[in-house]
UniProtKB/Swiss-Prot annotation:
Presence of keyword Protein transport: yes
Cellular component annotations (GO), alphabetically ordered: Atg1/ULK1 kinase complex; cytoplasm; cytosol; nucleus; phagophore assembly site; protein-containing complex
Subcellular location: Preautophagosomal structure
Known partners and oligomeric status: Forms a stable complex with ATG17 and ATG31. Interacts directly with ATG31. The ATG17-ATG29-ATG31 complex interacts with the ATG1-ATG13 complex. Note=The interaction with the ATG1-ATG13 complex is induced by starvation.
Keywords: Autophagy, Phosphoprotein, Protein transport, Transport
Organism of origin: Saccharomyces cerevisiae (strain ATCC 204508 / S288c) (Baker's yeast)
Chain's role: Plays a role in autophagy. Functions at the preautophagosomal structure (PAS) in order to form normal autophagosomes under starvation conditions. Also plays a role in mitophagy and regulation of filamentous growth.
Protein name stated in the entry: Autophagy-related protein 29
Pfam families: ATG29_N
């Protein structure tokens, strides 16, 4: 058997006079059976008991108190280390199971993307990257055309049109039909301006939804 720090005790003899009352440590026998009995006693202490009765244990095992204290400390350290390993193993198993669940959820999220259609949130299969880019470009083109259509019916673009028309017309020639058309255009511009101011917020919300801001 190989000697090591756990199964070997080294005694050093020091020259000189022995102190008064010094006694040689008693010889005792220690084995695995006694160690299991010691662990059974110290690990099943009553909650009402504040501390271990080392003197009583020393009488039971016929072993010095200092040795019992060292062995008890060693046993608690070993069992605490074993308990720590069990807890780490349990955490690793839980983490592994959670990772599997997260991978499954990520696959589902990648496979299905939410789409708003007819005020209902539906799950449809995700398109490839090229299809998504084409859809994005089509949506942007559609939104741009829609915005231009709204702006063309408003007073914003009509200002430039009226300005160019007024520059082409001579200042000294205005017929009656032209005046009537200007009045009708002014009234229609007022109506469109009022409707534009009312639907401005709705148009902005529609643009934000389409562009997914």
């Amino acid at each position: 058997m190989i000697m090591n720090s756990t199964n070997t005790v080294v005694y050093i003899k020091v020259k000189g006079r022995r102190p008064q009352g010094f006694l040689d440590p008693p010889k005792f026998e220690w084995n695995g059976t006694k160690e299991r009995q010691l662990w059974t006693m110290v690990s099943n202490l009553n909650y009402s008991q504040d501390q271990i009765d080392w003197q009583n244990l020393s009488k039971i095992f016929e072993t010095p108190e200092f040795f019992l204290k060292k062995r008890t400390y060693k046993l608690f350290a070993e069992h605490l280390e074993l308990l720590q390993l069990q807890l780490e193993k349990k955490r690793d198993l839980e983490k592994y199971s959670n990772d599997q669940v997260n991978e499954g959820m990520s696959d589902l999220i990648h496979k299905y993307t939410p789409t708003l259609q007819n005020d209902n949130l539906l799950n449809v299969s995700a398109s490839p990257l090229t299809t998504e880019r084409q859809d994005s470009e089509e949506v942007e083109t559609e939104v741009t055309n829609e915005a231009l259509q709204h702006l063309q019916t408003s007073k914003i673009l009509n200002i430039h049109k009226k300005t160019s028309d007024s520059e082409n017309k001579p200042n000294d020639k205005l017929d009656k039909d032209g005046i009537n058309k200007e009045m009708e255009c002014g009234s229609s511009d007022d109506d469109l301006s009022s409707s534009l101011s009312v639907s401005k917020s709705a148009l902005e919300e529609a643009l934000m939804d389409r562009l997914q801001f």
